[in-house]
Amino acid sequence: MKPILLVGEARGEVEARMNSSFVGPSGAELLRMLNESGIITFTFADRDYLHRYYSQSDPSCIEAIWGLHPEVVRTNVFQIHPPRNDLEYFCGPKAEGIPGYPALIKSKYVREEFANELDRLADEIMGSDPNLIICLGNTALWALGGRTGITKLRGTTLLSTHTAADFKLLPTYHPSAILRQWDNRPTVIADLMKAKRESAFPEIRRPPREIWIEPTLDDIRTFKSTFIDQCKLLSVDIETSGQRVTCIGFAPNNSTAIVIPFDDARQPSGSYWPTREDEAKCWNLVRSILGDSRIPKLFQNGSYDVSFLLRAYGIKTLNCAEDTMLLSHALQPEGLKGLGYLGSI
């Protein structure tokens, strides 16, 4: 089994003194999260070292734990301790930046004099040849993915485009950020659990999807009879503009869906359907699906969708069985509940 490579941003004061990576408070927290996510498994020796670290503040205890787990390899983008832990130490104007790399911090570019750090990182990646690289924080995402925005991209599998190309990446928050904002810890645990699954193979595997778009009335009837009428749980979602539904989607399983549009900006009339009669027939099909009490339905924030359909179109939705937003709130009341976030974990 190939190791998982953990890439952080830069050495802290403790790491610089120990000439190592992740041996201070961030390293201790990272080890705990790796254990909780199943990437490593603590033994009695691990727990003893961790107890001694917290009681004695001895970073050699954290170094000893890392030594017990060859299944993970750790490094940083910069094996340098910037003064005051300020990443702007590495940065300058665009004219001084490393060619081909975007800004790291607010129009500030990593100066070309530090390009040797990226060369060293590339050598480390090629030497360990991991199936998966976990980018811990924005700097690692910048160095390997050629972009920033850790909050938006965390939990997403990507291919590296910079420094060492075509390695699978999974970005998540840096453990030092977790020490500052504990609410994000469950998110990192979820990302690391995904990382464990992804580390079994080097390629990015996307599940197959069959999505029917721009359907005719006959397409909708066929999809309904083939997939919807006998499904065990039907996912439903609407998009709205003002007091109109612009489109509605139905997914009878996790690989098949249909998107039924009502608005189309390409048409002079603004409507997807060529005639009012066709649109009325389409709404009758939608009404028959939503009003079928035999079909359990799943929503995300369904109170909005169901009330909107009833208020704007007089459509009563029967057998609203589940709501992913409410389920996620019941499971983790303090967590985020948006559909994008739920999909990322």
Label each residue range with its predicted role.
Residues 1-203:
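A polyanion-binding, active-site-adjacent surface
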Residues 14-15, 19-32, 37-39, 204-345:
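Conserved RNase H-like, two-metal-ion catalytic cores of nucleic-acid enzymes
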